[in-house]
């Protein structure tokens, strides 16, 4: 049986823990054929690990899209898009394709950075991406920005944010709580427009988790492409990334990536699913 084809529209992380590198590794681990349309190149200062984001010229981006669409992706994922123009174009690309699924990872900051890359991007995501999204996968900060609620401190806050984001057009919302809500458990919240589900795993080490968000969204995309329902896809993605985080490793004094192959090579992590 031919592999399902999945396209990521994302930036390149030169350290290869996040970005399109994380996406392609995850797609391969989950038996899909990964393709990429690159939006930007992210490099790091060797002494401070501060990030430098270099956008690619729009004509180069368009040529990549032309190639990818000629192949015909079954599912499309977005990551770091960088500019309002590219955000708008990503939504148009999904509509122009025959892809069944559109997963939006609303990347707003680089790991370790505190400021939104481009504040205008948030409104562009709300306008051009959320109404088309099969699943949107914000972390707590991103969910606070997309919903307009700001800082989210509890499951109840996450439920309010998920409802607002759903009402903006996303078909399914999964908010990643991670380590922010509890030191012993990792909580995510999934909402399908009718029911809220809390997805829980044990909390594993958090020192080496670079690329966790990209990996989660990429896994969701691959699972959707291979036939899982959105609910099944996000639960499976939670298990996949939990294994990756648990087995994360130290790259240098500044960062350590998740192990994208841990789910298949080392262990599966159980996910507790409860209505809340």
Swiss-Prot record:
EC numbers on record: 2.7.1.35
InterPro entries xref list: HMP/HMP-P_kinase_dom, PM/HMP-P_kinase-1, Ribokinase-like
GO cellular component: cytosol
CDD domains assigned to the protein according to its UniProt record, in alphabetical order: HMPP_kinase
Job of this protein: Phosphorylates B6 vitamers; functions in a salvage pathway. Uses pyridoxal, pyridoxine, and pyridoxamine as substrates.
List of residues binding Mg(2+): 142
Pfam families associated with the record: Phos_pyr_kin
GO biological process: thiamine biosynthetic process
Similarity-based family: Belongs to the ThiD family.
Species of origin: Staphylococcus aureus (strain COL)
Gene Ontology terms for molecular function: ATP binding; hydroxymethylpyrimidine kinase activity; metal ion binding; phosphomethylpyrimidine kinase activity; pyridoxal kinase activity
Protein's UniProt keywords contain Acetylation: no
Keyword match Kinase: yes
Catalytic activity: pyridoxal + ATP = pyridoxal 5'-phosphate + ADP + H(+)
Binding positions (ATP): 139, 176-180, 188, 213, 238
Keywords: ATP-binding, Kinase, Magnesium, Metal-binding, Nucleotide-binding, Transferase
Name under which the protein is recorded: Putative pyridoxine kinase
């Amino acid at each position: 049986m031919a592999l399902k084809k999945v396209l990521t529209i994302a930036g390149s992380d030169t350290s290869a823990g996040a970005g399109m590198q994380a996406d392609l590794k995850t797609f391969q681990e989950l038996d899909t054929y990964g393709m990429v349309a690159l939006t930007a190149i992210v490099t790091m200062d060797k002494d401070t690990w501060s990030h430098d984001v270099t956008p690619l010229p729009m004509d180069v981006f368009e040529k990549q899209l032309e190639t990818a669409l000629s192949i015909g992706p079954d599912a499309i994922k977005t990551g770091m898009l960088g500019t309002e123009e590219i955000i708008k174009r990503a939504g148009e690309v999904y509509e122009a394709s025959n892809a069944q699924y559109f997963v939006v990872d609303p990347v707003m900051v680089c790991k370790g950075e505190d400021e939104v890359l481009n504040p205008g991007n948030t409104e562009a995501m709300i306008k051009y991406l959320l109404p088309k999204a099969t699943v949107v996968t914000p972390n707590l900060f991103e969910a606070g920005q997309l919903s307009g609620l700001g800082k989210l401190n509890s499951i109840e806050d996450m439920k309010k944010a998920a409802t607002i984001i759903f009402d903006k057009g996303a078909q399914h919302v999964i908010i990643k709580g991670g380590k922010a809500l509890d030191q012993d458990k990792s909580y995510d919240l999934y909402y399908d427009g009718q029911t809220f589900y809390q997805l829980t795993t044990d909390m594993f080490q958090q020192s080496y988790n670079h690329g966790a968000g990209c990996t989660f969204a990429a896994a969701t995309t691959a699972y959707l492409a291979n036939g899982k329902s959105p609910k099944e896809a996000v639960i499976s993605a939670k298990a996949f990334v939990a294994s990756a985080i648990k087995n994360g490793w130290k790259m240098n004094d500044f960062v350590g990536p998740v192990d994208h192959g841990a789910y298949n090579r080392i262990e599966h992590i159980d996910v507790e699913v409860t209505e809340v």
